[in-house]
Amino acid sequence: MDTRGRFLTERLRIKTPKHRGPKKVVPALVELVKPLKGYDHVSIGFPGYVRDGKVFTAPNLSTKHWAGFPLARVIERKLGKPTRLNNDADVQGLAVIKGKGLELVCTLGTGFGTAWFRDGELMPHMELAHIPIHHQADFDGYIGEAERRKIGDKAWKKRVKKIIPILATVMNYDHLYLGGGNSSRLDFKLPKNVTLVSNDAGMEGSAFVWHPKGPRKLANV
């Protein structure tokens, strides 16, 4: 990506290793980026609670294996480039927010990711995913990918439609952005202050982690 979040190469993908701890995932990441040349910085968007370059939780990978792992430092050493580690929803938010008022970014994928911004500044470490929403289920369990496969798209979309006014009441956002791989499944009418965003924003936002201007600049927080 360039500094404006524009793709300079095709998007590369690999399957998540069967063993989802760092011993398998880190080598897979290093192998993935081998074809890429001429980059200056590395940005990692991680699905969990991260701080100061370390992983603290990884509910959809394996917190047991990831807790306390210094992912930013390890990748920086292996690739030889300055590396920053942030929550994946936070990184996606950097690409889509307008920088005005209270903006909430939610990602619908394997789990439920959230990022919160005030006038363009990130309010980090917010994990709405683990708040109970229905009986004993949290947001992850209520509208995550495993549940979507279990109950089907029709019932899953009804659940997503149900939580939007709940989020509006609890967070009082000025604007809500819905992204992640499953957001493209939504086909019902959304409120005027709710916008569907491309899943590519998760990568586009990585450029703004290193962007030199404005409140969007983000280090390891």
Protein language model regions, located:
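A short, acidic, amphipathic alpha-helical segment used as a generic capping/interface helix at domain edges
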Residues: 156-169
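Short glycine-rich, Thr/Ser-proximal phosphate-binding strand/loop in the N-terminal lobe
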Residues: 1-24, 121-150
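Short beta-strand scaffold segments in enzyme catalytic cores
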Residues: 1-2, 48, 94, 112-117
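Glycine-rich phosphate-binding loops at beta-strand->alpha-helix junctions
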Residues: 167-199
